[in-house]
């Protein structure tokens, strides 16, 4: 792989605090987002991703304030998702200091919004966040066996996850953030089959997310086709040198890291 693999801590932000659960349930407080962002920047993170998991839209302004304060503190790229519905939200995030915006539910509901945002700001600004899971027994099967979910992984759509990733790439998204709902927070490793299938379908950069529990879990995700790897719990509650451990594991497997 010619381009260095990026290692990206993810901060799930709820009402101005970082939280983390298992399969998007049982959220527990992990700290102040600005402090954590500063810590990860100093530790050598290549980027940061903020995902606003706030249930109430009334707390969105809190998130914009967090983005502004974080952007003043850290100097690595910052991607922000959650509640992004169109050009207006992306514009506001960029003005508050974000470098990229991630879109999920709104794009599933109205795919044309991808075209509108990329036409306005360029592909490099837009990340499609795909929360995918294996189809459930009794639910409508999909060709790949994976379906797209919305609303933080709570709502199945019946849309094939691989086909959706391909459509979004064709529409011009700059990157795809592929999160396994089944693996999320379990610390059992990434869903390598899903990564391989999406990699075979798209040429845009692919960020793998969901399931990292130890440094050894990261190299297989890169080998499966991920250009970047994203994790939360392992960084929030792991030792202070976890970023170095993860990068060493990837480097020792023969991949370039920054």
From Swiss-Prot:
Main location: cytoplasm
Any one Pfam family match given in the protein's UniProt record, by short name: His_biosynth
CDD domains xref list: HisF
Gene Ontology molecular function terms on file: imidazoleglycerol-phosphate synthase activity; lyase activity
SUPFAM superfamilies: Ribulose-phoshate binding barrel
One GO biological process term: L-histidine biosynthetic process
Compartments, record wording: Cytoplasm
Active site: 12, 131
Subunit structure: Heterodimer of HisH and HisF.
Function: IGPS catalyzes the conversion of PRFAR and glutamine to IGP, AICAR and glutamate. The HisF subunit catalyzes the cyclization activity that produces IGP and AICAR from PRFAR using the ammonia provided by the HisH subunit.
Protein name: Imidazole glycerol phosphate synthase subunit HisF
Species name: Pseudarthrobacter chlorophenolicus (strain ATCC 700700 / DSM 12829 / CIP 107037 / JCM 12360 / KCTC 9906 / NCIMB 13794 / A6) (Arthrobacter chlorophenolicus)
